Amino acid sequence: MPRRRVVGQRKILPDPKFHNELLAKFINILMVDGKKSTAEKIVYGALDILAQKSEKDQLELFEEALDNIRPSVEVKSRRVGGSTYQVPVEVRPVRRNALAMRWLVEAARKRGEKSMAQRLANEMLDASDSKGSAVKKREDVHRMADANKAFAHYRW
């Protein structure tokens, strides 16, 4: 624990095109080696593909995809008396968003399509339909937490 003061979370500026803070955070998570304009091109390209493929609003689809990926519980390792238990704990809202975005980017990177924008768009479409590897990752995390429900009393 810090002895002085706890530093507050930095306010993130909304993205230039849609003026959405969540999308700006997503662009930052996708960014590699500080190349923000490249990350923006990829995300906006993916959203344009989403707009063409679906009659729904592209931002709405993005939000829906994230909703289907967000985990509500996860497991954390806790050492008790020489043995390590996987203790299920609830995920804080900020971490929920961060994990969902990270899993979406990882799943998109593993896909086989040619461009990253195409991969991201298809993964978002899959996630909004509750399928795809990002949603599978969430299911796995939830299953792991459910399997270790017996150790929930070790929560701290």
UniProtKB/Swiss-Prot annotation:
Parts of the chain that traverse the membrane: none
Family: Belongs to the universal ribosomal protein uS7 family.
Organism placement in taxonomy: Bacteria, Pseudomonadati, Pseudomonadota, Gammaproteobacteria, Alteromonadales
Name this polypeptide is given: Small ribosomal subunit protein uS7
A Pfam short name: Ribosomal_S7
GO biological process, one term: translation
Quaternary structure, from the entry: Part of the 30S ribosomal subunit. Contacts proteins S9 and S11.
Gene Ontology terms for molecular function: rRNA binding; structural constituent of ribosome; tRNA binding
PANTHER family named among the record's database cross-references: RIBOSOMAL PROTEIN S7
One cellular component (GO) term of this entry: small ribosomal subunit
Keywords carried by this UniProt record: Ribonucleoprotein, Ribosomal protein, RNA-binding, rRNA-binding, tRNA-binding
Protein role: One of the primary rRNA binding proteins, it binds directly to 16S rRNA where it nucleates assembly of the head domain of the 30S subunit. Is located at the subunit interface close to the decoding center, probably blocks exit of the E-site tRNA.
